[in-house]
Amino acid sequence: MNQKNPKDTQNFITSKKHVKEILNHTNISKQDNVIEIGSGKGHFTKELVKMSRSVTAIEIDGGLCQVTKEAVNPSENIKVIQTDILKFSFPKHINYKIYGNIPYNISTDIVKRITFESQAKYSYLIVEKGFAKRLQNLQRALGLLLMVEMDIKMLKKVPPLYFHPKPSVDSVLIVLERHQPLISKKDYKKYRSFVYKWVNREYRVLFTKNQFRQALKHANVTNINKLSKEQFLSIFNSYKLFH
């Protein structure tokens, strides 16, 4: 949670033991380039430069950028960039993984940018536990939007006592693992519109009564409130056929 904003609370993980314990749950290796979101005081950055080929640390706070540079000195495989991660242009021609202990209040925006504007195969983020569950929830728009690009797994609980100051919520380390897109790029705008109407239960806007019945039957739906990924995509494909 190291992207500074007056309304953000800065919660740092400072124990070297805890930092290593968390990073051991990632698959970051000496072959990897890493983009770190919110380097803060450099506690994770110090370990990341040891375990990877290179680190690009993104930090919005100028003072913390300087602290990060001092923390990793004299390592040479590190670049610290002072900018807002929501304005950062992800590289297009190199492979990289993402790591970040991210601010809770802009977690949604960061996850969307990683999913739709980066090319990272693996992104490891420390997030609020309730938020992680929402990312996996196929009853919500965010979960439905992400599922066509990412598999999302919880890897490790990160208890409040790991942080300074201690947050009032539980946190988890998650991984966003990119897979082959489940819909074509040309269909994404239509899919996004479909998702928002679906979660708002605007079924009559999407289908006629007969079309809706056919779509559910084709997807083998028995409970509209408990759809699998495959069932939802089947319903969307029926929608495309009808429109």
From Swiss-Prot:
<dbReference type="GO" id="GO:0005829">
    <property type="term" value="C:cytosol"/>
</dbReference>
<keyword id="KW-0046">Antibiotic resistance</keyword>
<keyword id="KW-0949">S-adenosyl-L-methionine</keyword>
<comment type="similarity">
    <text>Belongs to the class I-like SAM-binding methyltransferase superfamily. rRNA adenine N(6)-methyltransferase family.</text>
</comment>
<feature type="binding site">
    <location>
        <position position="11"/>
    </location>
    <ligand>
        <name>S-adenosyl-L-methionine</name>
    </ligand>
</feature>
<dbReference type="InterPro" id="IPR020598">
    <property type="entry name" value="rRNA_Ade_methylase_Trfase_N"/>
</dbReference>
<dbReference type="GO" id="GO:0052910">
    <property type="term" value="F:23S rRNA (adenine(2085)-N(6))-dimethyltransferase activity"/>
</dbReference>
<feature type="binding site">
    <location>
        <position position="13"/>
    </location>
    <ligand>
        <name>S-adenosyl-L-methionine</name>
    </ligand>
</feature>
<feature type="binding site">
    <location>
        <position position="84"/>
    </location>
    <ligand>
        <name>S-adenosyl-L-methionine</name>
    </ligand>
</feature>
<feature type="binding site">
    <location>
        <position position="38"/>
    </location>
    <ligand>
        <name>S-adenosyl-L-methionine</name>
    </ligand>
</feature>
<feature type="binding site">
    <location>
        <position position="101"/>
    </location>
    <ligand>
        <name>S-adenosyl-L-methionine</name>
    </ligand>
</feature>
<dbReference type="Pfam" id="PF00398">
    <property type="entry name" value="RrnaAD"/>
</dbReference>
<dbReference type="GO" id="GO:0000179">
    <property type="term" value="F:rRNA (adenine-N6,N6-)-dimethyltransferase activity"/>
</dbReference>
<keyword id="KW-0814">Transposable element</keyword>
<dbReference type="GO" id="GO:0003723">
    <property type="term" value="F:RNA binding"/>
</dbReference>
<keyword id="KW-0489">Methyltransferase</keyword>
<dbReference type="InterPro" id="IPR020596">
    <property type="entry name" value="rRNA_Ade_Mease_Trfase_CS"/>
</dbReference>
<dbReference type="InterPro" id="IPR029063">
    <property type="entry name" value="SAM-dependent_MTases_sf"/>
</dbReference>
<protein>
    <recommendedName>
        <fullName>rRNA adenine N-6-methyltransferase</fullName>
        <ecNumber>2.1.1.184</ecNumber>
    </recommendedName>
</protein>
<keyword id="KW-0694">RNA-binding</keyword>
<keyword id="KW-0808">Transferase</keyword>
<feature type="binding site">
    <location>
        <position position="59"/>
    </location>
    <ligand>
        <name>S-adenosyl-L-methionine</name>
    </ligand>
</feature>
<dbReference type="GO" id="GO:0046677">
    <property type="term" value="P:response to antibiotic"/>
</dbReference>
<dbReference type="InterPro" id="IPR001737">
    <property type="entry name" value="KsgA/Erm"/>
</dbReference>
<comment type="function">
    <text>This protein produces a dimethylation of the adenine residue at position 2085 in 23S rRNA, resulting in reduced affinity between ribosomes and macrolide-lincosamide-streptogramin B antibiotics.</text>
</comment>
<dbReference type="InterPro" id="IPR023165">
    <property type="entry name" value="rRNA_Ade_diMease-like_C"/>
</dbReference>
